[in-house]
Each structure stands twice: as structure tokens, then as C-alpha cells.
């Protein structure tokens, strides 16, 4: 699964730490999601979409391998 969190974060001028604080997670969680090493829970994916005013499918997309 690929995501555009890093791009959205840059658009909103947020650091990983700032985004993590807004979502109530660690900076490491944001880092691993951005690196496509961790797939977030449904709740966290929805929170990200809401924060960035996007649909979940606009932020997360399936890879051919998925």
C-alpha cells in the first residue's frame, strides 16, 4: 500500500512531530507509515483523511503487490 502522507504533510507545513501530536501517535508511527513499512488502523487512516480534508482513497492506494 502506498500513501501520500508526506506530500500532504508538506502542503500543510507540518513536521512529522506536529502531525503525530495532532493524531495522538508517536513521530515514529508517522515515519513508518510514510515509509510504507506500517499500514495504519482504519481509525488512524480516517483521522488522517479528516485532518487533510481528503478521502481515505486519495491518501492511501493499493500497490500492484497488494
Give the residues covered by each predicted segment:
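DNA major-groove recognition helix of helix-turn-helix/homeodomain DNA-binding modules
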Residues: 43-58
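Short basic helix-loop element that most often maps to the first helix and adjoining turn
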Residues: 3-22
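Residues in the helix-turn-helix
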Residues: 18, 29, 58
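Recognition helix of helix-turn-helix/homeodomain-like DNA-binding domains
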Residues: 25-38
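Short, charged recognition helix plus adjacent turn
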Residues: 60-66
Amino acid at each position: 500500500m502506498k500513501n501520500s502522507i508526506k506530500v500532504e504533510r508538506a502542503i500543510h507545513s507540518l513536521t512529522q512531530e506536529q502531525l503525530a501530536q495532532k493524531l495522538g501517535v508517536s513521530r515514529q508511527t508517522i515515519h513508518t507509515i510514510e515509509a510504507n513499512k506500517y499500514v495504519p488502523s482504519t481509525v488512524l487512516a480516517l483521522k488522517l483523511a479528516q485532518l487533510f480534508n481528503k478521502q481515505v482513497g486519495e491518501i492511501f492506494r493499493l500497490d500492484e503487490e497488494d
